[in-house]
Amino acid sequence: MAKQVFQTTFAGRELIVETGQVAKQANGSVVVRYGESTVLTAAVMSKKMATGDFFPLQVNYEEKMYAAGKFPGGFMKREGRPSTDATLTARLIDRPIRPMFAEGFRNEVQVINTVLSYDENASAPMAAMFGSSLALSISDIPFDGPIAGVQVGYVDGQIIINPSQEQAEQSLLELTVAGTKHAINMVESGAKELSEEIMLEALLKGHEAVKELIAFQEEIVAAVGKEKAEVELLHVDADLQAEIIAAYNSDLQKAVQVEEKLAREAATQTVKDQVIAVYEEKYADHEEFDRIMRDVAEILEQMEHAEVRRLITEDKVRPDGRKVDEIRPLDAVVDFLPRVHGSGLFTRGQTQALSVLTLAPMGETQIIDGLDPEYKKRFMHHYNFPQYSVGETGRYGAPGRREIGHGALGERALAQVLPSLEEFPYAIRLVAEVLESNGSSSQASICAGTLALMAGGVPIKAPVAGIAMGLISDGNNYTVLTDIQGLEDHFGDMDFKVAGTRDGITALQMDIKIQGITAEILTEALAQAKKARFEILDVIEATIPEVRPELAPTAPKIDTIKIDVDKIKIVIGKGGETIDKIIAETGVKIDIDEEGNVSIYSSDQDAINRAKEIIAGLVREAKVDEVYRAKVVRIEKFGAFVNLFDKTDALVHISEMAWTRTNNVEDLVAIGDEVDVKVIKIDEKGRVDASMKALLPRPPKPERDEKGEKSERPYRPRHHKDHKPKKEITETPKDSE
């Protein structure tokens, strides 16, 4: 295929798509240029159906450091495992694409996005999402797209599509919305306590922009799209399905309606084991034994799926007996752990999360060095999901994509209410340990995080709570569920997580298994979520009504001082010698930023005070009109040098020592004397002049007589230097001759 170029303008930036030039051996590939961001997307499908009971889709997002003109960090100077941001972007692309493949599709599909050049004002993640959909759409891979996504901001009361970096920094909203031309199918958002009405407006305007991108994709597909390949879909034998349903559907229905999770799982598994045992014996010698048993397992899954949905849509009964808008029993506990800086345990039904707070000096912040300029991340929220939380065994190790994603969602929800660095100069880490799970564990971690922050004395603006909403839809009718449990999440059509305060939403996340949802469903889900959020906040506030006024005794205390930027090198010293000496002497931790903010941390307040004194002395400057108790350190004919403090000396000129005239400095002071001086001048070179006499009483002026005239003083003739007095001649009386 020859190279073809397609071009349009979107959100004020040029959008160019190139096909037929690179990566031509992939099933589909495109180069997307948005602004000066360039992303290569290649989509590949395996030739045969994969084994397993799930669709093996893999979406990667690769950040090449050369795209931003940077070297990779570390010793190897080569890109390694994906960054957290890259992992989250890959999930962001995967989620709207996954529902667009046919039920029963089992061929492995890989979609690889490589960022080749990076423009911080033109969203590379959105270019990658666009490219992923387009590469699949023009390929022969059976994909029921296209889809597209946009970023949405909210600045000065205005909705902005794909905001620039400057606009994003000012925005009260960080929203990504994706979907088809008919409906929204993915949402990811952080927000600064925005109302449901503003969020809905942003979602709908975002979807209007999505439609523009889809129309552009359809134009390209019409020009260069391949005919879709015929692939085998996983279908079960219809006769076998009818046979199993007739024999065992009644037993499975009874098992599904057991209200308690573990008992229900045991009951359904008993029915499934019974069916499997019957058919293993029946077809033990059959040449297609593996296919038949795979069909049996799939049929049982479909039967359970159908019964859960029937109960909710027809009988309006949930598996655990709740109403559609009812929350499971709630419990909140603070101070679950001793010694730590704060802890909260939150339980909702059979979902339970423990959140643990750690406060640290700002030197513990995480340095993020990706395609954007390097920055420091002050707040971290980490989410762990051990297998024992669902009563199973499994792998243990580094967090997977799901754990990273759930941690990021909680981080966005809670970050909106954290105090500023000036108000609370700490690095903050929350770790959520999921101890039990039956759905909505990410939202439980947000509630537990609020408890831990408040118990730990972090002055958050308001408590945050989270709730997960679900959806069961048969095409014509739908039911929105509040606080979905695991079974409803697994067999339902939507997982819509909403977190916020009483004043507004701080985070949204929505994934669906159908191809989209309407504005009507979104409106209803947001309204039900608000009601549920307030109920949970009632429980949190009853447990801990206000943020504690003090930090835990084990938390590091902190004090801050501000120094001039040009004094930073004095405090640090050559090779860090000075600051290391202060730390060794006092036992504190010290952080200094590039603006001269010095943060001193210790559990011992006396140690902090001592370190502050040392630093204040190092950077102290003499000021005009200030008085100092100084020590004479050197004497010259013209005056004495005195030490004001540390390494700062001043000259007291002989004329500034006393009101009476003296010709000898040593008549007034000696080396080692301590004298009070007042600074009277500092010249442009920083040289200090001081005065002793300015602090002494001025001698009285000469007295005046009753007429107000000065009293007479002895006459002292003054002569010009060249004047010679005449010689007096005395005549001798003649009589004396």
UniProtKB/Swiss-Prot annotation:
PANTHER family: POLYRIBONUCLEOTIDE NUCLEOTIDYLTRANSFERASE, POLYRIBONUCLEOTIDE NUCLEOTIDYLTRANSFERASE 1, MITOCHONDRIAL. SUPFAM superfamilies: Eukaryotic type KH-domain (KH-domain type I), Nucleic acid-binding proteins, Polynucleotide phosphorylase/guanosine pentaphosphate synthase (PNPase/GPSI), domain 3, Ribonuclease PH domain 2-like, Ribosomal protein S5 domain 2-like. Keywords: Cytoplasm, Magnesium, Metal-binding, Nucleotidyltransferase, RNA-binding, Transferase. Mg(2+) binds at residues 489, 495. Residues 625-693 form the S1 motif domain. HAMAP family: PNPase. GO terms for biological process: mRNA catabolic process; RNA processing. Its cofactor is Mg(2+). Its EC number is 2.7.7.8. It comes from Streptococcus pneumoniae (strain Hungary19A-6). It holds the Pfam family S1. It is found in: Cytoplasm. SMART domains: KH (SM00322), S1 (SM00316). One of its GO terms (molecular function) is RNA binding. This is Polyribonucleotide nucleotidyltransferase.
